[in-house]
């Protein structure tokens, strides 16, 4: 069925500078044991070379999920362009039970028609499991490929794909008038652009529920301040600039509130702002430090870091106040939690015996799993479908972004070429 992609104009980001020094995913572990699949190079039906390798993007997406291992083109028994051309037995002989085929056709109006079919080669050989086509301009060819990937991934795994999401992060470059940059890129590092440049540090970006805004911490006024920036036009709204510390913003899933930490009265405590009215209410109090709030799916409950027991651990509390409940018990300390979109688990930065790694806490069973083995891991952020975590870690003298699947099996890194990269934040579905 023909489907014309309708994407908000705001995401063209015409006001922002597109960068050439982009991050790219480099897989380091786990793909070899993933489910094999065939993603045939999409047939180009125009003159010269295709403007984008759509089939290659689909294959990379499925590989980056950690759940699939597309075979190399030189191992494919055939390279069909349509389902009717697929010979199922040739693929099942290689242990492959599903094949993606497709075409890209240029139109007279300058647009492109991208079509794909997902073909079953084992259960019901030759059956088309999913198919779609998209009419897009050249600049949206990657988006069309990610859309196909999302549909294929969901059909085969039962999990909603997150290949059309984005990541925000802070890059500290070497020198220059504005060495700190808040950037946004597609989840795979492509289409990177600058949201904000600053001579002073930028920290802790957080996405709004609809993906149209970013909250973050800036020090441009000489002290910390919390701001919200609209991506479509660059407009900045100052949220908090109280004495001492203003930090750790987190939008509620329903989009109505922003939680953050302030130390205007001495110790760090949690506060929540009603974004419509601007009214701020205090959630925690006392002499302990309470910070790094993150919301549960109900938009009423917060997980956060507190040192009320001596060392940092993760607790939860109702945003309207009440008694806190401790969530983490394993390890010397746990902090900087992020709760999954379904509320079934959270990830933290866990420290024990001098090591600092990303851990997963199952909120149903209480089971804890250490996911990473990198060095000085920080600021984890979960993909909206709950399958992957992005975080920063130390590598050499700098900081880089890393990916790990929430089962700990698949690992990858996103090295940058022009600075240290910190504070990654995964967007909601866009």
Swiss-Prot record:
Cell division listed as a keyword: yes
UniProt keyword Flavoprotein present: no
GO annotations of cellular component type: periplasmic space
Alphabetical keyword list: Cell cycle, Cell division, Periplasm, Signal
Main location class: periplasm
Pfam family, one: TolB_N
Gene3D superfamilies: TolB, C-terminal domain (2.120.10.30), TolB, N-terminal domain (3.40.50.10070)
Single biological process term from Gene Ontology: cell division
Signal peptide: 1-21
Compartments (UniProt record): Periplasm
Family of this protein: Belongs to the TolB family.
Free-text function comment from the UniProt entry: Part of the Tol-Pal system, which plays a role in outer membrane invagination during cell division and is important for maintaining outer membrane integrity. TolB occupies a key intermediary position in the Tol-Pal system because it communicates directly with both membrane-embedded components, Pal in the outer membrane and TolA in the inner membrane.
Assembly behavior: The Tol-Pal system is composed of five core proteins: the inner membrane proteins TolA, TolQ and TolR, the periplasmic protein TolB and the outer membrane protein Pal. They form a network linking the inner and outer membranes and the peptidoglycan layer.
The protein's name: Tol-Pal system protein TolB
Organism: Pectobacterium carotovorum subsp. carotovorum (strain PC1)
Gene that encodes it: tolB
């Amino acid at each position: 069925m023909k489907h014309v992609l309708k994407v908000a104009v705001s995401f063209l980001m015409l006001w922002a500078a597109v960068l050439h020094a982009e991050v790219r995913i480099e897989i380091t572990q786990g793909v070899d044991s993933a489910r094999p699949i065939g993603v045939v190079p999409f047939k180009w039906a125009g003159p010269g070379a295709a403007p984008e390798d759509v089939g290659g993007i689909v294959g990379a997406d499925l590989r980056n999920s950690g759940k699939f291992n597309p075979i190399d083109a030189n191992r494919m028994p055939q390279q069909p362009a349509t389902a009717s051309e697929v010979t199922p037995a040739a693929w099942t002989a290689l242990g492959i039970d599903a094949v993606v085929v497709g075409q890209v056709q240029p139109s007279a109006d300058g647009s492109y028609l991208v079509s794909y079919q997902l073909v079953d080669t084992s259960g019901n050989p030759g059956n088309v499991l999913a198919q779609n086509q998209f009419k897009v301009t050249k600049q949206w060819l990657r988006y069309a490929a990610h859309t196909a990937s999302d549909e294929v991934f969901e059909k085969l795994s039962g999990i909603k794909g997150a290949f059309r999401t984005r990541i925000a992060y802070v890059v500290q470059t070497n020198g220059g008038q504005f060495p700190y940059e808040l950037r946004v890129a597609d989840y795979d590092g492509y289409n990177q652009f600058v949201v904000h440049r600053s001579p002073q540090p930028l920290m802790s970006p957080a996405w709004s529920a609809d993906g149209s805004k970013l909250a973050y911490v800036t020090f441009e006024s000489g002290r910390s301040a919390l701001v919200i920036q609209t991506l479509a036009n660059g407009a900045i709204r100052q949220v908090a600039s109280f004495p001492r510390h203003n930090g750790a913003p987190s939008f509620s899933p329903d989009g109505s509130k922003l939680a953050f930490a302030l130390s205007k009265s001495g110790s760090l405590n949690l506060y929540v702002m009603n974004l419509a009215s601007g009214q701020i209410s205090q959630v925690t109090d006392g002499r302990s430090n309470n910070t790094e709030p993150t919301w549960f799916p109900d938009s009423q409950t917060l997980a956060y870091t507190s040192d009320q027991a001596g060392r940092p651990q993760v607790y939860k509390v109702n945003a309207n106040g009440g008694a806190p409940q401790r969530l983490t018990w394993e390890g010397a300390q746990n902090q900087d939690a992020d709760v999954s979109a379904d509320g079934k688990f959270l990830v933290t930065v866990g420290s024990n015996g001098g090591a600092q790694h990303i851990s997963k806490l199952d909120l149903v069973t209480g089971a804890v799993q250490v996911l990473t083995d990198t060095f000085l891991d920080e600021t984890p952020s979960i993909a909206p479908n709950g399958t992957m975590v992005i975080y920063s870690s130390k590598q050499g003298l700098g900081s880089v972004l890393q990916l790990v699947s929430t089962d700990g099996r698949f690992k990858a890194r996103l090295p940058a070429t022009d600075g240290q990269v910190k504070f990654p934040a995964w967007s909601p579905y866009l």
